[in-house]
């Protein structure tokens, strides 16, 4: 499969934006990578990279060829996975792009439980904002995406989804910690840590505050849920998290927000449209899909 290695070279150059950087990443000589690029351009009869003073940039023809190269590599990964499964070898890797809200609790637990069933499966998890997570799927950088409030689903297939309510996160010794639920106005008396606009949870909270006519003045805004949770714990304040990501956490208690017509967010499991997933990724998609279905039923 020597020709697929050449396609891998092209993909690396496109991702790095430089022949030299791609060669360093691939641990080969720059001349070897440049030669493969030139071979492809000669065969196609057109440049696939525009040479710039610092690096290279894909041409329109290069964009088309890169899509072909990535589809070929994805097809090969899927075939390899199926062959291993036929032989009774339960190995493989799942590459997942996920929203940050799922990183502290839900994903570690789900992956661990899945690996107890299929211990040969390894995971490569990329925690990204929702726009980059969607792009990781379409760019063949990830098999699956688990994204909260995705901005655009063009080119993607929704495999499973769940509506998500908002929870307040407080320290175990916080005055609100013993409540079964709470109103948003109850939070205003305490320092609040809110997500910044790069996190999809911010738009849900803005809708929630607008609905309740609350005017928050947060002393901390961050793009990190761990930072917000840690600050709230130290300051005796409140941070926020979607319910599926608000599982048991060291030093934090989750309390559901109880508001009329409470705005909810949408958590979706997605894959590239028309792509046949590798066996390991398909199995994990089925496993997580069942978890999301349970979350929907629990929220009804």
Where are these regions (language model features)?
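Conserved amphipathic alpha-helical core elements
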Residues: 40-41, 114
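Short helix-boundary/capping micro-motifs
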Residues: 11-29
